[in-house]
Amino acid sequence: MNFSNSEAIQNRANAAILGGVNSPSRSYKAVGGGAPVVMARGEGAYFYDVDGNKYIDYLAAYGPIITGHAHPHITEAIKRAAENGVLYGTPTEHEVVFAEMLQEAIPSLEKVRFVNSGTEAVMTTIRVARAYTGRDKIIKFAGCYHGHSDLVLVAAGSGPSQLGTPDSAGVPKSVAQEVITVPFNDIEQFKEAFYHFGDQIAGVLVEPIVGNFGIVEPHAGFLEAVNEVAHSHGALVIYDEVITAFRFCYGGAQDMLGVKPDLTAFGKVIGGGLPIGAYGGRQDIMEHVAPLGPTYQAGTMAGNPLSMQAGIALLEVIKAEGTYDYLDKLGEMLETGMNELIEKYSIKANINRLKGAMTIYFTDEKVENYEQAEATDGEAFAKFFKLMLHQGINLAPSKYEAWFITIAHTEQDIQDTLIAVENSFKQM
């Protein structure tokens, strides 16, 4: 494949944009460096770069493009919205319609509020939980990414009795001291954290299905135990469904798993590809937010006409019967084929999959927590990534990220992907 135009544009980007990218996850630093491929357009399950190369896309903008790129129903909705003005700063009927659709899909949303990103949604749920409980500390799980606000950029201490440390320059130690980080799927360490700090903990922030160190499901009974322990100590449970909402089930991970949180944060996945976030939950908790309560949150772009109408159009598409069965069918086909190739070529790898999302980990061990994900072979993944890229398969440039299948993918796409996987394994 020729990447000369991508390389030339990236050289310009390096001169004009910090680090050459507008999000570190787009850099190829984690896969051995080099200029990231610059895309020109997306259509269905495919990307086309500035050199004219075509890719089967499994990045899907890190998950939200469930319908595939440039889905006509969503595109037309955005065009209609833009023709009537892109930003009002006033209420619109579309934000009411979209809120009602979210409430219908996810019953825990007794009240909902729109914001502009998943980071903003999570940040606000933490503020609301603190206001409601009158407490300051938060529990999060190791390796789970919840955006880039200070309170969630915190690494684990040496154990559940130890408070966190900053995971980024610029995060004050005083902020990190309000966060306890414990391993996902380890209910005993979770209980120990409450033993030490139970009357200080405002809320527990959890991805009900992990999507940020690959796809990792909770152990049976884990989320139920999280609810029980948190509520017995007067703490709230906050679900981060920025990745999981509408990806595995129309009602979100909480509906699929049958566990109800107190608050939920949403992000990119609900917006059909446009910037968006939302949070919601129990009415008595949400009424602590302005203008009804003393907890302040606002945003000029919140509930803007473009994002609202794109979100409505997205839900209209994916609510159709068979959406999730189709994603599961293609996911199973891809997983089965890859496992056969792993065995055929004696590749040291494991796959975690849930419906239309999966991760390949280069390790002999099944990954169930962040420590295990961190220990996987990053060099092997980097080689695999480059080999797949040169065969027209677009993946996230990180061993921690998932592959996302869309309703635009076909069985032929899966077969073509498996051919590329086999060619890659032959060279590893």
UniProtKB/Swiss-Prot annotation:
GO terms for biological process: protoporphyrinogen IX biosynthetic process. It catalyses: (S)-4-amino-5-oxopentanoate = 5-aminolevulinate. It comes from Macrococcus caseolyticus (strain JCSC5402) (Macrococcoides caseolyticum). The modification N6-(pyridoxal phosphate)lysine is found at K268. It is found in: Cytoplasm. Coiled coil: none annotated. One of its GO terms (cellular component) is cytoplasm. Keywords: Cytoplasm, Isomerase, Porphyrin biosynthesis, Pyridoxal phosphate. One of its GO terms (molecular function) is glutamate-1-semialdehyde 2,1-aminomutase activity. HAMAP family: HemL_aminotrans_3. It comes from the Bacteria. This is Glutamate-1-semialdehyde 2,1-aminomutase 2. Pathway: Porphyrin-containing compound metabolism; protoporphyrin-IX biosynthesis; 5-aminolevulinate from L-glutamyl-tRNA(Glu): step 2/2. The keyword Isomerase applies. Belongs to the class-III pyridoxal-phosphate-dependent aminotransferase family. HemL subfamily. It is an enzyme of class 5 (isomerase). Pfam families: Aminotran_3. InterPro entries: 4pyrrol_synth_GluAld_NH2Trfase, Aminotrans_3, PyrdxlP-dep_Trfase, PyrdxlP-dep_Trfase_major, PyrdxlP-dep_Trfase_small. Its EC number is 5.4.3.8. Its cofactor is pyridoxal 5'-phosphate. The gene is hemL2. Homodimer.
